[in-house]
Amino acid sequence: MLAKKLVTAQKRGETRALCLGLGMVACSMMMYFFIGITIVPFYTKSVWTTETICKVLKANIKDKTHCTNSEGSEDEDIFHYPCLQVWVNLTASGQEVMLYHTEDTLERNPKCSYVPGNSENSKEVKARIETIASNFKKYQTFPCYYDPGGMQTNVILSRLYPPKGLLFTFLWPTLMFTGGCLIIVLVKISQYFSVLSARQ
């Protein structure tokens, strides 16, 4: 009687472990799918892939520009901010090009090197942009990214999704997938040895 209870408890534990392993594998596959349709397209779309050295030629704050709080919005709620324009000398080609913060900056406003968030306080934004401009004048040489294919003649300061960041994004689903597969394999091995011991 005790042996039957032990066998029943063992089978329940194996079933739960197997469900856990399958659940981890399923969750990891969903995470892979989510990353594949959200982050990977942005990474492959970016053409600024080669790192080089940029030297600041001029960093000026132009007249205030504006951006709407949402694309296609008919509201008159418009956010104004100083337009910072940074021009640099691209070491790789010797050209004078405009610097943008990230790939997203160019899409949001190609006239400005930095675009703040819409919900930020205007005074804080003005102070931050002035600080950024002074930092560019203080630190005139820094690494930047350019398009080796020549499709984009401008450069960016940092990539939204660099290769290391993309690998780190895939790390957690990979660990979950590996752990789930390991649990399933261990359960199957346990079941195999249980069958062998039952035959003896």
From Swiss-Prot:
Keyword terms of this UniProt record: Glycoprotein, Ion channel, Ion transport, Membrane, Transmembrane, Transmembrane helix, Transport
Where do the record's glycosylation annotations fall on this chain? N89
Gene Ontology molecular-function annotations: calcium-activated potassium channel activity; potassium channel regulator activity
Instruction: Indicate how the chain sits in the lipid bilayer.
Output: Multi-pass membrane protein
A GO term (biological process) for this protein? Answer: detection of calcium ion
Q: Which parts of the chain does the record assign to the membrane side Extracellular? A: 41-166
Q: Give the transmembrane ranges.
A: 20-40, 167-187
Query: What ranges does the Cytoplasmic topological domain annotation cover?
Result: 1-19, 188-200
Q: In which compartments does the protein localize?
A: Membrane
- Pfam families documented for this protein: CaKB
Superkingdom field: Eukaryota
Q: What InterPro entries is this protein classified in? A: K_chnl_Ca-activ_BK_bsu
Is Electron transport included in the keywords of this UniProt record? no
Query: Per the record, GO CC terms?
Result: voltage-gated potassium channel complex
Family statement drawn from the similarity comment of this UniProt entry: Belongs to the KCNMB (TC 8.A.14.1) family. KCNMB1 subfamily.
**Functional description taken from the UniProt entry:** Probable regulatory subunit of the calcium activated potassium KCNMA1 (maxiK) channel that modulates the calcium sensitivity and gating kinetics of KCNMA1, thereby contributing to KCNMA1 channel diversity. Increases the apparent Ca(2+)/voltage sensitivity of the KCNMA1 channel.
Q: How does it assemble?
A: Probably interacts with KCNMA1 tetramer.
The protein's name in its UniProt record: Putative calcium-activated potassium channel subunit beta
Organism, scientific name? Coturnix japonica
